[in-house]
Every structure is written in C-alpha cells, then in structure tokens.
A protein has these predicted regions:
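A cross-kingdom marker of C-terminal helix-rich interaction/assembly modules
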Residues: 1-118, 137-305
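Short, charge-rich amphipathic alpha-helical segments embedded
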Residues: 116, 123-139
Length: 305
C-alpha cells in the first residue's frame, strides 16, 4: 500500500463519520506535515542552544559505531566466535541504536522519551562491561531463554556494581573517584527511571518543558519542543559513552583475568586508528566540559527531573 492510498482511505473515513454525525469535518489532513515543520523548528533550537553536548554526542556515536564495525567484521556469521565477542557485538550494536535515538529524540524536542533511551544506553554499555569482565556471565547471557530472569539475577544494581568496581580497580582508578562516579550514575538513573515508570511529575514535565531558547518560560511539548532539560540528557549520554571508552575499550583490547583480548589492535587499519584516537578525543572533551552548564539555574533546581 502506498502513502497516498492509505491517506485517501483514512480521509474518506473521517469525512464519512463526521457527515454521519451531522457535523462539519474537523480532520486536519496536513497534520503530518505540521509535525514535520514542528520538528525542524525544534532541531534548529537544539543545535543552536544545546552545545557542546550535542556535538560531543555526535562524535561519541561515531566512535561507538566504528568500534562496533570492528567487532562486526570479527563476529558476524562466525559460529566459533566466543560468547564475549558475540555479547560485545550485539550490546554495542544496540547501544549505537539507543545513542542515535537519544540524539534524534532530543533534536525532535522529546526529552522524556530521550531520557528513556539514555537509560537503555547506560544499561547496555554497563552490561557489556560486565560480559567482558566475566566470560561465564557472557555465555549465560547468550544462552539464556529467560532474559528478564537472567537480568534481575545477574545484572541487578548490586551485581553490576560488583563488576564495574572490579574493572575500575584493575585499571587503577582511585576508590574515591569510583565511589563518586557510582553515586553520580545512581542519581541520574533514578531520575531517568521516572520516564520509564509513569509518575505524575514525570508525565507533567514531559507534557510541558522549560524552553531551550527561553529557559525561564514553559512550552507545550506533547509534539516536541526544544528543551532546556535536554542538557542533562545529552550530558548523561556523553558521559556514559565516555565511561565505556575508558573501561570497556580497555577490556576489549586487553582482556581480563589472564583471558585473551577479543580484538587485536591493527595499527594500519583505519577503523582501529579511529577508535584509538577517538577514545582520547572523547576523554579530553568530556573532562574539559565535565561541569559545564548551559542552564545552571535549571540544573540547580533539578531541571525536569
């Protein structure tokens, strides 16, 4: 069926039912075009107002996609590939999609849904680190027929924290920094979870949002509106990918606990060059702007969270 065919069929139904009700038709046939125009206006405001985080996310997605492409060359169609390789392959691929969803939704002015995608991004990248840390966990993850049960048993907050702490310690991260990072992540996830499980406040702040171009004002956001709250969303997504670039990358190219790495560095390969150099670029950008605030008055009051 073509777009014109279903559009004609639907319009005729609207006209018929309004006619049967003895009322003038109120149907807006150009509503899809209206939404498209609305999205373009939001996108321009986001690009203008939500830097540096939007650009850093673009670079982060490019880095993540290159790393996935290297894994894809190794894993796709290879029956003998290890569970760790295959788990990293699928989890990084899904992470790329979630990161792209964060970007697209923020540009469209849909910050609430973007936060749900950012939460999924964090869960996938954290799970990937856990799989790279524990080969038995990776084997179980690949083979399980009850993914929900496996997740709650093996990748709950406490279990995941154990894996992340072990990896950070092995990489020489100071314990106090590890604690601070864990507390920050926990606080952000608690806020972002409000977009997944309905609450009155989260629903209200998805419906209406502080405008990116005038943060002292509130805008209707039911169809999307560039949001000042998206600063926090983009910031979290960028730092989540940065965290993986430090620790997940290390495990991919170095292995853990005496186990061999799942990738061997090829200094002449362009994609390998991209992920090695990009890892350092992302580190410099994120550390430079770690505490940068576009809307300090919003962040100080908890913005939309």
């Amino acid at each position: 069926m073509t777009y014109d065919e279903i559009r004609k069929e639907a319009r005729e139904l609207w006209l018929q039912f309004f006619r049967d009700a003895w009322r003038e038709c109120q149907y807006e046939a150009e509503f899809a075009e209206f939404i498209g125009t609305h999205e373009l206006k939001s996108e321009k405001k986001v690009v203008d107002k939500l830097q540096p985080w939007l650009h850093i996310l673009d670079d982060s997605i490019q880095w993540l996609a290159n790393l996935w492409a290297i894994l894809d060359r190794r894993a796709y169609g290879q029956q003998e590939a290890s569970s760790q390789l295959k788990c990293a392959w699928v989890l990084l691929g899904a992470s790329c999609a979630h990161a792209a969803a964060v970007r697209r939704l923020v540009l469209s002015g849909l910050d609430g849904p973007a936060r749900a995608a950012a939460r999924a991004l964090d869960e996938h990248l954290s799970a990937c680190i856990a799989m790279l840390h524990d080969d038995e966990l990776a084997a179980g993850f690949q083979a399980t027929e009850s993914p929900d049960e496996f997740w709650y048993r093996n990748l709950n907050t406490k279990a995941l924290k154990k894996h992340l702490n072990a990896v950070e310690s092995n990489c020489g991260l100071d314990a106090s920094i590890s604690t601070d990072m864990r507390e920050w992540r926990h606080g952000e996830l608690r806020t972002f979870s409000q977009t997944v499980h309905p609450s009155y406040l989260a629903a209200a702040l998805t419906m209406k949002t502080f405008a990116a171009d005038a943060p002292e004002t509130v805008a209707n956001a039911i169809l999307g509106s560039a949001s000042a709250a998206s600063e926090r969303t983009l910031d979290f997504a960028c730092k989540t990918i940065w965290y993986f670039s430090r620790f997940g990358f290390f495990l991919i190219y170095n292995g853990y606990g005496g186990r061999p790495a799942i990738l061997q560095l090829d200094k002449e390969d362009e994609m390998h060059q991209m992920v090695v150099v990009g890892r350092d670029v992302l580190s410099v950008l994120n550390r430079k702007y770690w505490e940068y605030e576009i809307y300090p008055e919003q962040n100080g009051s908890g913005d939309n969270g």
